[in-house]
């Protein structure tokens, strides 16, 4: 282990040495840039752009571009980046993480790589954790980029698509991580290309990168809508299908008569309306053509009502308990609590059984931050604390963590932890130290891990008449103002972990002489990184400072991992005195080893999440790419549509003509052709079910499709309208099936753990089942596109 750490440390040093040489080059241009007039310095931007067009790379331009950005910062912002900030900027440009201590000027560091990468014209996204920081940085740093001739945009959730499109078209765009992810998902739900807002994802610099890529990595971004089903539609469809009669006649295509309204094919558990059933549906719902594009949702409700009433069996497939429909596991016979059939089938069964139909919001699109940010051409980030998660950044995001040296030596005092037997004795000691330091005017920042702890401490300070501010990470703008004053003489501030992050605490007059900012931690967090963030609030830019953590045996982390060893150790030293305190490096080491265990567990969980998510990621990319192809098409989608219809014909004909001719399911084949491809008249006059061969029938049906396509082209007359019709058909079907598939995959994932009991690897099972479900969905999409396209009657009022 020591060898590995040594290697990593040396790799860090080697990388920094390389950066030092580049920083020398940047600094060598300083005098030259300082000698230029404002106009000459501003003229560098178009000069760099034309050099890029002629083939120079961004790496070639780096020393000069960084020097230009640096000189412009001095003139516009009154700030001149230090050498260590140049090193940080190089790390960011290289697609790595620059670990820079609090107060070392991360925002200014980012200006150099942002300027350099924006010259390419492909867009740079500067990502922050909340909209207050995004808008603050866009206002402050935007002046610099605009002065240099770049365009700057701010992307926030309240904007219209038009405003967002403008923001994304800028050279530099400030945004939050969540808004970027949601915009990506929304872009892949549009029906016209002009509705999209994002450009291809080029380069992102993430501020507080550990918070976004580690702490929130597993948070899925979800866009959901009211599941399209109106409950009344399920009831209407249910009432209709309950009146229908099954056609139980044998598979004999010679008999043209329907003997019922629907037919069940038990080997495949499929059910479909016969011609009589289709006519009854048209009469019942007052329609001319059931399979018209406009009636797609109704057809879906009827299909599910048929399955619910005639294929799903009560007490075998499901049970009704306390007015609820519960699924029965077909393998174990057990009731599966909390699970629901997908694709509206559950609601259809609820309608069948007359119980309350549960509203469901349906996930229309979803992605995790891990998968969203991995799509950028180049990704980089800044934070004060990333080294502890170095392995995760390297393995998952292919980013190295480069620790950037501080501009001035750190002289802060980090004291050993103090351990108390109980929470009460610990908080009493915290208040005593606050009183003592407050009395001499030293500013104090107290970190807590929960709102409950903050309120407890606040109450105790009120009793002691010590004025203080409490931050709970709710109001970002107000909290930034409070945090900015937390370094003033006499200030006492209580903050939960994330509150006020991103805002520096600057020391007020006379505070250095009092020992700088005192930071008191009231509990160790399960992640060392969060503790380090709290410590890093003090001692910025070489200022004096003091930090100390107070622990008790009743703290969550100590209860989970400190165990009996620490308790025995404490008992031996404290003689059962509740107020007895132990100050020991051994305790600190014990706590840190507990934290390492938790971090390891959390990393394994995130890694596993990613492995599961990768299954969905691959499927999402396929669907979004196909969707984009449809949206992008300017001429005709015949080349997309025809193969889909041909594959459907092949699949259906093969399915119904397996084995010996005597076992062919001719009735089912005939029903498919009538309900999805042709009129009854055509089937009766043109297809001879006694003598046909499967291959000859396929060719005949291909020709039928070609003729139908040409008829529609002629009816629409305008190629643009034909293209619009094709897009309507494909996008409607794809979107509906994809939404249902997301739901089904989610249900699969929730149930897959149970398969682990059968000595099966749950991940492999999920991959296999997920792949099969995806293939099935593609087949269903092609089937529905076939039926919708072939059966649609052309009218000129298409709406997507």
From Swiss-Prot:
A biological process (GO) of this protein is: protein import
Top-rank EC class of the record's enzyme: translocase
Q: Provide the E.C. number(s) assigned to this enzyme.
A: 7.4.2.8
> Molecular function (GO) terms listed?
ATP binding; protein-exporting ATPase activity
Entry annotated with the keyword Translocase: yes
Per its UniProt record, what SUPFAM superfamilies does this chain match? Helical scaffold and wing domains of SecA, P-loop containing nucleoside triphosphate hydrolases, Pre-protein crosslinking domain of SecA
Kindly give the membrane topology term recorded for this protein: Peripheral membrane protein
Transmembrane spans: none
Annotated InterPro entries:
Helicase_ATP-bd, Helicase_C-like, P-loop_NTPase, SecA, SecA_CS, SecA_DEAD, SecA_motor_DEAD, SecA_preprotein_X-link_dom
Cellular localization per UniProt: Cell membrane; Cytoplasm
Q: Does the keyword Nucleotide-binding feature in the UniProt annotation?
A: yes
Reaction it catalyzes: ATP + H2O + cellular proteinSide 1 = ADP + phosphate + cellular proteinSide 2
Output the Gene3D superfamilies linked to this UniProt entry.
Answer: Helical scaffold and wing domains of SecA (1.10.3060.10), P-loop containing nucleotide triphosphate hydrolases (3.40.50.300), SecA, preprotein cross-linking domain (3.90.1440.10)
Q: Which residues bind ATP?
A: 85, 103-107, 504
Question: What CDD domains does the database record attribute to this sequence?
Answer: DEXDc_SecA, SF2_C_secA
Q: Which UniProt keywords apply?
A: ATP-binding, Cell membrane, Cytoplasm, Membrane, Nucleotide-binding, Protein transport, Translocase, Translocation, Transport
Pfam families referenced in this protein's UniProt entry, alphabetically: P-loop_SecA, SecA_DEAD, SecA_PP_bind, SecA_SW
**UniProt main location, coarse:** membrane
| Subunit details | Monomer and homodimer. Part of the essential Sec protein translocation apparatus which comprises SecA, SecYEG and auxiliary proteins SecDF. Other proteins may also be involved.
Protein family membership: Belongs to the SecA family.
What's the stated role of this polypeptide?
Part of the Sec protein translocase complex. Interacts with the SecYEG preprotein conducting channel. Has a central role in coupling the hydrolysis of ATP to the transfer of proteins into and across the cell membrane, serving as an ATP-driven molecular motor driving the stepwise translocation of polypeptide chains across the membrane.
Q: What is this protein called?
A: Protein translocase subunit SecA
Q: Which organism is it from?
A: Lactobacillus delbrueckii subsp. bulgaricus (strain ATCC BAA-365 / Lb-18)
